[in-house]
């Protein structure tokens, strides 16, 4: 799994981007990929662990967990 920092996340629209620690390209994240109960959102600068998978417009995050 990769580790990164949330660049931004729009809770109203339910998506944002993660900057991976390995300095690779930013990864799209959709609220449905966030693990946990309750309202699923991320905050700017949250550290997260995630997997990547191919999405309709390129790489996207999957199984996102806050650290």
From Swiss-Prot:
Signal peptide: none annotated. GO terms for molecular function: DNA binding. Keywords: Activator, Cytoplasm, DNA-binding, Transcription, Transcription regulation. Residues 4-64 form the CSD domain. The keyword Cytoplasm applies. It is found in: Cytoplasm. The lineage of its organism: Bacteria, Bacillati, Actinomycetota, Actinomycetes, Micrococcales. This is Major cold shock protein. The gene is cspA. One of its GO terms (cellular component) is cytoplasm.
